Amino acid sequence: MRPTVRPDTAGRIVRAADDLAVWLSERGQSESAEPFTFVVALDGLLRLAPRRSEHVACAGGDDVLAAGEMGFRRGSGRWTVHEVTNQSTGYCPDLDSWHAVARALDRAGIDHPGRFTHEIVFRRCERCQERSVVREGDFVCVFCGSALPSAWNLAP
């Protein structure tokens, strides 16, 4: 997919809370009520794109520190993150990618819940090489039935 990513599809960079407020105001009320696709680029900055965007496109085809979906709520005159996940089947980020998300949000002055509100555990099956989601702590490949490794193994 990376070769097909055009530079104009990269997500909106959010350096400050005002950047977020402007971008969300451009989205409209119904779209702003949905979660958005996000990545934290290698420069540590948050990038946002509409929910149905591919994470790889949001990142401009580059590697990332974190990826997932993020939802916002407005309260006390400002936008805050009320839900955030590492749900990205393109990048399959590990749970420790939260640290990059928190740093990007803190840097921009955007309040957040302090963790992923919904965590997804990804692993690559060493036997069949498929990407799998670990459900309910069951580290078994849904494709071939082999045991999945306990440590994250989906680095680019």
Q: What function would you assign to each model-found segment?
A:
Residues 1-64:
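General detector of N-terminal leader/presequence modules that precede the first folded domain
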Residues 38-39, 70-72:
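Broad, structure-driven detector of short, well-ordered beta-strand segments within folded domains
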Residues 42-43, 73-77:
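Short acidic-glycine loop/turn motifs at beta-strand connectors
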Residues 51, 75, 86-89:
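Beta-hairpin (beta-strand-turn-beta-strand) motif
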Residues 85-156:
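Cys/His-clustered metal-coordination modules, chiefly Zn-binding fingers
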